[in-house]
Amino acid sequence: CAERFAQTEGLNTELSYWHWPDEVRPAAAGVLQQFGSDLQALAMSRDGTAVPLEWREGVVAGDTAQYIFTSGTTGLPKAAVISHARWLMAGDSMQLLWEITRDDCFYCFLPLYHGAASMSLTATAMAAGARIVVRRKFSRSEFWRDIRAHGITFCQYVGEICRFLLSAPATDSDREHSLRKMAGTGLTPEIWQQWISRFGAVFQIYEGWGGTESNTNTINLDNRIGSCGRVPFWEKTNLRLVRYDQEKGDYIRDENGFLQLAGVNEPGEAIGMVIQYPGVVAGRFEGYTSEEASEKKLLRNVFEQGDVWWTSGDLLRCDEDGYCWFVDRIGDTFRWKSENVSTMEVGDALGDFKGLDAITVYGVQVAGHGGRAGMAALVMHEGAGFDPRAFWELAISRLPRYAAPLFVRLMDTPDMTGNYKLRKVDLQKQGYDSAQTGDPLFVRNDKLQTYVPLTAATLEEALRG
């Protein structure tokens, strides 16, 4: 990929990524100035010939190529630094792992400011010389039409995309398409199974784990439903899972103060050893534009004095065969009635509720009560009504009563992140205050075996129960 980008007369294509040491970088002010004008007008004015060499004079692989904002699902977005080397490496590695050729056609419906679109998808297509079909915004009604019209073979999913598509009415042509490969994160085992049952078992689904700024990741290469990848040789990677006490909100350390590795099937936080070595791209942590935000993601003296590790904030578990499974985000587990509740487990259990487009689960504070009560924000499919009794029956049949959401919020115009997830941090702040939400609110009533509209009286009755 790097060589293809360098097909300009007079440019040495044999250079390594790190032609200059990190501390000796020529100024790239001239390059930045060139792109300070209207980028679209600049692109449309090109006639297909190579751009002038002086535009790239002084640019090295370690320089910043772009800033990608994190999704902001659980907090304010942060601008992650993406170097040219990281972007190129993403394309080269994914092309090999996904076995992409120039005959493939990618479908990009994600915003190009999102890491999945601007890095792994776009960089991979360019590395292989494959085509990309870009849609300005995801459309459930146009998705399969686009797939068939353009002969698309590969698309990337995030968030609730697969659930959105499954909620559309089934048709006789559901299996008549060219799509063969999909990659992304957040595909639950239930949705995964429903997807291949409805749209065909021809799919190679590359479920993975990682993040825009992460310096390590996993990817499922053999269709193990629900797994986000397999690590056969941990000692050959910079990834580790370390023990974490969710109740205390802290790491579990040994007698010397160092962290401990999680055992088989024991949830542990995923961390990546930071490798800042000239000539090595993998393992780098390029951080954010804010040094303070970057430092908060680093953990020092983890297994020995002086080592530095990037912290993900994600809990994973690894089974006896080396397969990794996403457990939860640290902080997404709340405590209610002296029990720990995983927001992900609750969301997965209720995710196939009839007519549901999207669900997010979170804990909200209740005056006079310790811990946080569960609340589910629901987005229903257009034209689908909310059946409170059916939702109560589903929740009680699949979850312990302490984990079944106490509150339900129905949202007509949800505030979604760029990767199609409900913005949880704002939902938590609003809680069950009708003055702030402006949405229909329900509270669980076990005596009536249903969810009833939230009032002061119905809330008091629910809390007594």
Where are these regions (language model features)?
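AMP-binding/adenylate-forming catalytic core of the ANL superfamily
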Residues: 1, 155, 272, 276-403, ...
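Structural core segment of the AMP-binding/adenylate-forming
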Residues: 1-44, 54, 170
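Conserved pre-ATP/AMP-binding loop-to-beta segment of ANL
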Residues: 20, 36, 44-69, 76, ...
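AMP-binding/adenylate-forming catalytic domain of the ANL superfamily
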Residues: 20, 399-422, 439-463
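Gly/Ser/Thr-rich phosphate-binding loop
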Residues: 41-43, 127, 144, 149-157, ...
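Conserved S/T- and glycine-rich ATP-binding loop of Class I adenylate-forming
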Residues: 64, 70-73, 106, 112, ...
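Conserved AMP-binding/adenylation subdomain of ANL enzymes
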Residues: 88-105, 113-153, 168
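Conserved beta-loop-beta connector loops within the AMP-binding
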Residues: 240-275, 279-284, 384-388
